[in-house]
Structures are given as C-alpha cells and as structure tokens.
Amino acid sequence: MTASRRTLMVMAGGTGGHVFPGLAVAHRMEAAGWRVVWLGNPAGMEATLVPKHGIPMEYVRFGGLRGKGLKTKLTLPFNLLRACWQSLGALRRVRPDVVLGMGGYITFPAGVMTALSGRPLVLHEQNSIAGLANKVLAKFAKRVLVAFPDALPHAEWTGNPIRAELARTEAPKARYASRSGPLHVLVVGGSLGAAALNEVVPRALALLAPGERPRIVHQAGAKHIDALKANYEAAGFAGGDDVRLVPFIDDMASAYAAADLVICRSGAMTVSEIAAVGVAALFVPFPYAVDDHQTTNAAFLADAGAAVLVQQRDLSAQLLADWLRGQSRASLAAMAERSRSLAKPEATDEVARVCAKVAGANLEQLQ
C-alpha cells in the first residue's frame, strides 16, 4: 500500500487546545500524501473550523459531565453507548490505518472503539496533567505522546504540535539585540478574554512613571474590548502609539516575535508557542482550570527560569508595577533564550512520524 492510499483519522474537539495541534499534524500528513479524516462533535468548534481546512469530517455526539445537571448524568449510559456506536460506524466507513487521539470528550468513546476494532491508536496529551480519558485510553494505545514530561507514565515527550511559522521565528538573542527604547509588552487574554489581566494591567501601568512605562499591545477578545478600553481610560490612558487595544490578533507569530514580554494565561498551546518562539513570559494561570493544569503548564518554564508564574490571587497592580520596574531588555532576553531551549519545534513532524510508523509506513515518506 502506498502512502497516498493510507488514511489517518484525527479525533479531537471541544477547544482550540485540542483542535489546533490536531490540524498541524493533519496538514503535515496531507503534505506527505496521506488522506486525513476528522472525527468530531457536530456541536463543537471543530465542526466549523476543520471543514475550512478542507478536511472531511465524521461526527460523534458526546459531551462532558462537568458542570452539567442530573439529567445529563442520568442519560450518560445511553449517550456513551450511542457515541460508541457512531464511532464504530465512522471507523468502518473510513477504515483508517491509524487513529490519532488529540483530546476532547469524543476521544473516549472513539478511542475505546478504535481499540476494540483492532485499529492502531496513538494518543497525544497536550497538558501537563493528563485528562481522565487519556489516562484510561493510554492502556490500549500503541504509542502515547505528551507535550510535557511525565504527564503520563511510559510516554514519549514530543512537545505540542504548533503552526510552522511559530517554529521558524528568528532566535531571541538576535531579536532582542536589535531593539532599543521602551520594552514591548504583549498582553494576551485569548478569544474569551481574561478579566483579571484586563483590570490589573492598566492600573499597574498607571503606577509607573512615564519614562518607566512599556509599550503595550493588549488583546482582549471581541466581547471584552469595550470594557478594556474603559479600564485604560479610567487609568488615565486615552490610547495612542504606546497603548494598542485589539479584539484579536491574526498573526500571533509576529506578535510574539515583536514582544519583549508576554503577559498571559498558561494554556498548553500558549506555553508551547511561547517556548517555540522564545519570548519572556509572565503567566497568570486560570484558577478554575481542571486539575489546575495551567499552573503546572506554566511551572514547566518557570521552574527553569524561563518564565515567571504569578497566581491570580496574588496578582495586584502594585506587584506587577514593581516587577516591571525591575526588568530590563537584557534580563528578559535571557529568560527568552532559556524558554527557547526548552521548546520542541519538531513536535509536528515527530507526531506525524509516530503515526506513520504505527501504520507500518516508511518514515522516509515524512522527511
């Protein structure tokens, strides 16, 4: 069987943290001549996003229990059985040579049926603390891959698959050396915004003398941009060249590369992207993340002196202002270089090669 006839099924959904790394691998496999089919939830973001990338989809209806009512919990056995049946149907139609599980609730029933049908399963865990589904499925997978060391026992540390342009960014030493003047700070709230950052950062800047203030690009999410503007105006900033407030950023690679410092949450993909680019970071983990995984994500870099970790409960305008006052471009450049040294820029290729090998393909087809 030639590479062009081989098929990869990617099962992932729910959040961008599962979908985007799955897309990175999918495109890499397509470039090697593979057919790729995506298994996802028709109600998930993947149902809208994945077809835009030209990847056909199979659908399985299955959701989580966290925060759901009694009715959802009582109907779980039926919903799980239905999801298993739908997954089996998709596997029979697609007949994949290998199945790659990238996370999300649908991974559990689809992964179980993959194992029961005798098809090879590869798992990838994006977070530093594995979810329950991957902990169970790891017992049946041919290969288990992790983005952070020790997330699962007997797993291979590959890093998180990221967009190619992030891995191609110029080395931090050269970037930082080419700059002068005020520090450039990127504040990232994500598509959902981060209220704590939106409130504290403007007040922290107001505590700095004009000559101490960095230039700011602050991304807040479309739903939060008006409130963010009000926060900056209340702190005495009317906007201008030194403060840019944006609802979204299309080119994150360039935004990261232009920054001396990123202030942000610590989702798995954010941490992986920051390391890949090599930029200093101050992480404020989302305090309500499942198993507090954002803290351990951030700690991977912070423990190596490659980032700073501040819990939201400890974050204040005074603390942030004092910390910013003590930073120089040289100190941030050193942090950025340590961050880059911990990156896994070949993660996308490595995950693709593992999938090919499990399917019995010649690895030279993925060079």
From Swiss-Prot:
Membrane topology: Peripheral membrane protein
Annotated Pfam families: Glyco_tran_28_C, Glyco_transf_28
CDD domains tied to this protein: GT28_MurG
Taxon lineage: Bacteria, Pseudomonadati, Pseudomonadota, Betaproteobacteria, Burkholderiales
Family label: Belongs to the glycosyltransferase 28 family. MurG subfamily.
EC number(s) stated in the UniProt entry for this protein: 2.4.1.227
Localization of this protein: Cell inner membrane
Membrane listed as a keyword: yes
UniProt entry keywords in alphabetical sequence: Cell cycle, Cell division, Cell inner membrane, Cell membrane, Cell shape, Cell wall biogenesis/degradation, Glycosyltransferase, Membrane, Peptidoglycan synthesis, Transferase
Binding site for UDP-N-acetyl-alpha-D-glucosamine: 15-17, 127, 163, 191, 249, 294
One biological process term in Gene Ontology: peptidoglycan biosynthetic process
Gene3D superfamilies from the UniProt entry: Glycogen Phosphorylase B
Catalytic activity: di-trans,octa-cis-undecaprenyl diphospho-N-acetyl-alpha-D-muramoyl-L-alanyl-D-glutamyl-meso-2,6-diaminopimeloyl-D-alanyl-D-alanine + UDP-N-acetyl-alpha-D-glucosamine = di-trans,octa-cis-undecaprenyl diphospho-[N-acetyl-alpha-D-glucosaminyl-(1->4)]-N-acetyl-alpha-D-muramoyl-L-alanyl-D-glutamyl-meso-2,6-diaminopimeloyl-D-alanyl-D-alanine + UDP + H(+)
Name this polypeptide is given: UDP-N-acetylglucosamine--N-acetylmuramyl-(pentapeptide) pyrophosphoryl-undecaprenol N-acetylglucosamine transferase
Organism encoding this protein: Burkholderia vietnamiensis (strain G4 / LMG 22486) (Burkholderia cepacia (strain R1808))
Role of this protein: Cell wall formation. Catalyzes the transfer of a GlcNAc subunit on undecaprenyl-pyrophosphoryl-MurNAc-pentapeptide (lipid intermediate I) to form undecaprenyl-pyrophosphoryl-MurNAc-(pentapeptide)GlcNAc (lipid intermediate II).
Gene Ontology CC entries for this record: plasma membrane
GO molecular function ontology, one term from the record: undecaprenyldiphospho-muramoylpentapeptide beta-N-acetylglucosaminyltransferase activity
Major place of residence: membrane
NCBIfam families assigned: murG (TIGR01133)
Metabolic or biological pathway, per its Swiss-Prot or TrEMBL entry: Cell wall biogenesis; peptidoglycan biosynthesis
Enzyme class: transferase
